[in-house]
Regions:
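The catalytic Tyr-centered alpha-helix of NAD(P)H-dependent dehydrogenases
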Residues: 54-58, 92, 126-127
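Conserved sequence/active-site signature of Rossmann-fold short-chain dehydrogenase/reductase
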Residues: 48, 92-94
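Mid/C-terminal beta-alpha module of Rossmann-like enzyme folds, strongest
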Residues: 140-191
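Conserved phosphate-handling catalytic cores of large alpha/beta enzymes
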Residues: 75, 81, 86-90
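A conserved pocket-lining segment of Rossmann-fold NAD(P)-dependent short-chain dehydrogenase/reductase
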Residues: 102-125, 129-153, 157, 177
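Conserved Rossmann-fold NAD(P)-dependent oxidoreductase catalytic core, especially the SDR/UDP-sugar
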Residues: 6-64, 68, 74
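Short glycine-/small-residue-rich Rossmann-like dinucleotide-binding loops
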Residues: 3
């Protein structure tokens, strides 16, 4: 999987979101059909559900494209055998740009730890869970489905920051609320 996934960067560079996320998915999906790939697993995001930002919109367009291509193959409108399935993730802990390394670095520097809003919540999963979802979708999918991993209850980001500060043993670290960024939601949806 390759995509731009950072909301602020895509808000500032919408044309790159289209070029990389949408055009990149379209080219790879079309090549999968052309060369007879049996299964195509697209990695999407919870931000594609009722999208409020460029990145979420770009991933929703990708979801629609691969589902449409899958249906066109089933209907005989496109010649091919590729089955297209989609996985939809929340935030993957430990991935590039994850909040955990950011908070660790901010704590190490003595703070402040920056959180956009006191009520912001996010779903999280671990890298092995994300890998498992992709593999399961590739194995179980028959084409056209969107697979969503049960990520449990969403986590309040301020609670995560407070826990990390407490576990660090460092006293007096301030949590600073910076305000929601352009396109950012207070909460994400998975369905």
């Amino acid at each position: 999987a390759a995509a731009y996934k950072h909301v602020p960067m895509m808000e500032d560079n919408p044309e790159e979101s289209v070029r990389n996320n949408v055009d990149g998915t379209r080219v790879i999906a079309d090549l999968a059909v052309k060369y007879g790939t049996r299964k195509f697993v697209m990695v999407s995001t919870d931000k594609a559900v009722n999208p409020t930002n460029v990145m979420g919109c770009s991933k929703r367009i990708c979801e629609i494209y691969v589902q449409s291509l899958d249906q066109a193959i089933k209907d005989g409108k496109v010649s091919g055998r590729t089955q297209f399935v989609t996985t939809r993730f929340g935030n993957v802990l430990g991935s590039n740009g994850s909040v955990i390394p950011l908070f660790k670095e901010q704590i190490k520097r003595g703070g402040p730890v920056t959180v956009t809003h006191k009520d912001i919540i996010r779903f999280f999963m671990l890298i092995p869970e994300a890998c498992k979802l992709v593999l399961e979708a590739g194995t179980m999918g028959n084409g056209g489905e969107i697979f969503v991993f049960d990520m449990g209850k969403p986590v309040r980001i301020v609670d995560l920051a407070e826990r990390m500060i407490r576990l660090s043993g460092v006293k007096g670290i301030e949590i600073r609320f910076t305000g929601l960024r352009d396109g950012e939601k207070l909460y994400e949806e998975v369905l």
